[in-house]
């Protein structure tokens, strides 16, 4: 059974491999959130790789989209797609580009790019969940590492 430390170490290793293979990217910003993503995806969040659009899943928005390698490595570690795909980061035709794209990668709840836009999107998701009486939590990481909670009735 893997521990949070094991998951975090694998995620960090894959971030370095991806950015090195791509010869571009933001390793510092990605490495800085590896532990947070590990705790969220392997301890806190209700997500399912086999059913990534599950209605009452928790949502995650990476507002600092340039740290996408961390999110990709986490999603692969969680089983959303094969780890072997990680080395296609930023390659022509790859679904793993420099910023997350919710239409191309299972497990991504919001496409992000411009710094800060994800915070307002996460706020809208949380409000929609509250208005619809849904039981999910919305998390976001922005440049200031903001944590946004929707509501919990669990």
What are the functions of these language-model segments?
Residues 146-153:
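Conserved small/polar residues in nucleotide/adenosyl-binding loops
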Residues 1-139:
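Thiamine diphosphate
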Residues 142-143:
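Acidic, proline/serine/threonine- and glycine-rich low-complexity intrinsically disordered segments
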